[in-house]
């Protein structure tokens, strides 16, 4: 703590001091609230809404509204908010993050700002990390809101769109971050306004805010459909990958190294950078790939797919580990969530990595998915007018919260002082010695009936410790990837006397571990970490499971110099130091140098991960601006707006572009290339061909005016073919919607390919993000032009008797973060399928070439 903090207190302490007068006002209202009958207390909601209509602000209502919720919670749940919980509620209402230690009642805190902000009638979202917590909190805390006359909904993974719509229309909705994000994306893929499920994003309270906005922010949300590409190349590249030899690089090729002209000396066929999770082919490796595929130059654009797939195969073999990153179950590769250690059914790695792993594991390779819609959590949550967050650990990432989300962190004091003892790390030379020490420590605690929670990073380690404990005859529970409903129950029982629980990472987070009298007397819950995590914050989360509400407890991490964290950040040097000191087997090492090395390694990885998230955001910021434009245009079409003027604008833009491309002011009209102009424009707008007589003596602008007049008259003639003008208006909406969706989905894929290839510009001393922005701008403009041309072309060639109905452009097959496969938005029933439509079976072929042919042959 620096001198300023010692004299004036930390920033959090100063913020809490500022909030205290408000807390006193709430406390002073307590006797008044206690006198009210249930009916009078409920009537406060109507009173507050009326005052808002009359011009009062939420801040004006805060003391009384909070006092109302406090009294309601006491009557309904038998729980009254502590002073520190009132402080937390105020911080959340202000759109900040309240750091509250485990067991301080964060769930109850959320009832205060959610009630106050729900009074505006725009909806409040309380966001949690899993369905179990969303349902539990909606059931328990929802009682308080219902008592006060508000409606409460919950959105769960298996709900149908109509159930979701009903839940989102409630005053307060409990929902997971994944469901919330995917519903937003799905809403921007629906074909009828009535299919929308969400309202505008007004205010949200994010529980476990660090987990959602930081840990999960490295991967964007992706909704995917099936691509038509063959899977053969994955299997071929897998065979080649196993023949290539792994080498080493003399040093990393950084941007600075490239600028300075430093040469990187590489051995073998490929090198692996485990820190950044990157694989690169060496010059020798490139030659082997070219020879294997009988191609001249791997870098040629037509060989991009081979290059991409061989890198994927090498990543699958060298960076993706079975029983750590994924498991193979029932002939299927299933992802393991790196933050909870749970299997995620229905979730697949995108961009072909999942297929590469399937080829590696010799299971059936499924077709690659095509991205239909995507968004990062950073950009999604920044769409809210206001957001607040709660967690037990946020201060270490305060800079990121402030820079990316414009949220600052306020540390809320605990209701009772923390009694937990956090012991120094126990460090051993090898993993074997470390695990022996862990088992010995569990054994000692178990003998005196002290409950133990052992935290592991991988499934493999949890199963290893389980086997070792079985050999010692110590009964225990294991919580890893096999998610089941009993998980929360097992975690809740982890504080009972003699209980031993092994949990992968933070399974069961959000569930309180309560002690009984025997375990309290034995020293409280003992936390054993079997490895330091990449992030100090996640280590602190594990520690925070013990010592809730002033309970006793202790925590200690057991580390070996063979652990991944140490191995990646130079433990060879430390290994040599301690070998020379002659450390005996099973002897614990204690040295200042070790503590520093561990902290430095974590800081490096945290900085690295921040870089990954920042990089993702820099690129997605470009996508976000484009996404906003497309989604706004789409919503106008869905809202049933009259698109006639927009279509006329498209027609005139197309004429302008064609004239500008083919005619020049600098040459006489006799020299204009009329053939080129006719072929460019007439395939879109079927005007009469331009002849030399028509253009003779005319200026370029004159021609623009004449052609526009003719094009507009032609469109008016098309309008007159329809008995009802609204028929053509609906056709305009249908065709425009189809064109937007089709082009936007292709554009998402093109942008991803661009992003992957743009990194090479760093070697040319150019900023990749700037290059990406420039290229993305050009690509977006091309896409807009393409949408306009497609729409106008179809409208000029449509016939009155043609029946064109709205339909989804692509079939949704899954998402990358859902707990199960994704639901397709409800479609109108009995949609007629026409010969040139995509076949409903999802084959990607036209109906007439697929099921339509079978039907015709019957």
Q: Residue spans of the language-model regions?
A:
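Small disulfide-bonded, cysteine-rich extracellular recognition modules and tandem repeats
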Residues: 10, 842-844, 853-854
